[in-house]
Amino acid sequence: MAKVVGIDLGTTNSVIAVMEGGQPTVVPNSEGFRTTPSVVAYTKNGDLLVGQIAKRQAVINPGNTFYSVKRFIGRKFSEIEQEAKQVPYPVQADGKGNVRIFCSAKDKFFAPEEISAQVLRKLVDSASQYLGEKVTQAVITVPAYFNDSQRQATKDAGKIAGLDVLRIINEPTAASLAYGLDKKSNEKILVFDLGGGTFDVSILEIGDGVFEVLATSGDTHLGGDDFDKKIVDWLIDNWKRIEGIDLSKDKQALQRLTEAAEKAKIELSNVTQTDINLPFITATADGPKHLDQTLTRAQFEQLTSDLIERCRKPVEQALTDAKLSKQDIDEVVLVGGSTRIPAVQQLVKDLLGKQPNQSVNPDEVVAIGAAIQAGVLAGEVKNILLLDVCPLSLGVETLGGIMTKMIPRNTTIPTRKTEIYSTAVDNQTNVEIHVLQGERELAKDNKSLGTFRLDGIPPAPRGVPQIEVTFDIDANGILSVTAKERSTGKQQSITITGASTLDQSEIERMVKEAEKNAEEDRKKREQIETKNLAESVYYQAEKMGLKDNAQELKNAIDQLDYEGMKNLTQQVQTLIAQKASETSNAKTNGKASEKEDVIDADFKAQE
């Protein structure tokens, strides 16, 4: 069977891993790094850049460099208005209220799924190169607290990247697979996952190959980006107070501040103070201005104290839902780069009364777990049973705008639940089923996943018709809803995909565009390689004295005639080989003739 890869599609960085010889292995990217920045950029010429190369040019191209896109995936614009203000690229709503990102270099709008697909494609290309075979199937991880539309959108991103996404699994669950693969004894573990843009807490019982999620909680608006933003705001406020200049209006300066803030945050995990130096941050009539600030760890902890405090409630909620106390937890596993922050580690110790287990690499553990799950699906890994849960309650809107729960949060999936409902008024011939996700009592306060109508109900007094509503959640955590009128057998169903912000025709168009882009990228790479080889052969031909042939090849290079370059390169390489052979033979013959001229003589030793 073809290899199935595991992918951690992160807010800040992404990782891909695969099972090799029964062990999960992280696949390095084409630059040789084990993690790939989740950054996509388009140059002024419209060329696509992904990963480290895109991140490096962000300062000079902030409006066309897209990062932290995971915060927007599967969401409506009304849900992310605050986050949209934190990035230097334009984020807008389309006619349906979906999030769209404007790229001035291409003069077009992109869906977040399209941007994420470019990151996935880079990872998969690296894996295909590494394995020596084309990779088409994957397991992709998502934050445990992602709702249905965010999960579906992640699956769509995989599809646009040319992948068959076999399974969507929760990041903390994947981390537990990596941590507990060789554990034989039963343990209750708490996975504390604070990434670049999301925060999850999951409690699992693991042992003898069974991984059962007992409860999950989280906050999809909390992550390392928010810690960076606190430093950026502090720098902007200080600069405004000292210099009277507002740097938040300058996109290039803002990008430099964001990068400096991330660097300072990382440094403060190891040292107690750091210097932030940004020469030529701006200029006035008096000349250039240079930013030079010192940030201590104590100041950083004070700036981010509200964010640290926000990590507390999901931990307490997960313990309550699992009906456990902190004494029942055997191990605490830290996941995500932001868990390196000392104040975060201290909070975990205070909340759970134990030292966190740091035996796993927080940047790679999720991808490794995804690779193990991929191995299970591919039949490479045996004797593992994964029992995950749905993170949020699912239900329907009933009379009076009430949210009636069908499947409570933390129900083990896959699952199926049926309830009987009826009509609200006499002679009602249709019903509208409004599907909701969330924990609030009123329908309007929860996330709307979609609506559909069941027609053809026979006229009858209110309360008489029996409408059977079935909720079905698959192993990916994606929901299907069916409504059936019992007396007629008429039914209507919906797979909740509308909230993913893309319809099927849009996805198909994006798949074609992505394939076209991949083909264009391949052609560009081929052309660069052809030109590089032609130039190398041209210099060799010059040295060998093949002036006419070299000039002909040089003309093809100057005219960017790639077909001509290919043909002439082959011809000139043949001539170079012939000339080298002739030179070698001439030298050999010369040595032989020299030897023939030598007269052998006997010398007598003098006594």
From Swiss-Prot:
Keywords: ATP-binding, Chaperone, Chloroplast, Nucleotide-binding, Plastid
Residue ranges, compositional bias (Polar residues): 579-591
Matching Gene3D superfamilies: 3.30.420.40, Actin, Chain A, domain 4, Substrate Binding Domain Of DNAk, Chain A, domain 1
Record's compositionally biased regions (Basic and acidic residues): 592-607
Main subcellular location of this protein, as a coarse class: plastid
Subcellular location: Plastid, Chloroplast
Region annotation (Disordered) ranges: 579-607
Function: Acts as a chaperone.
The protein's name in its UniProt record: Chaperone protein dnaK
Gene that this polypeptide is encoded by: dnaK
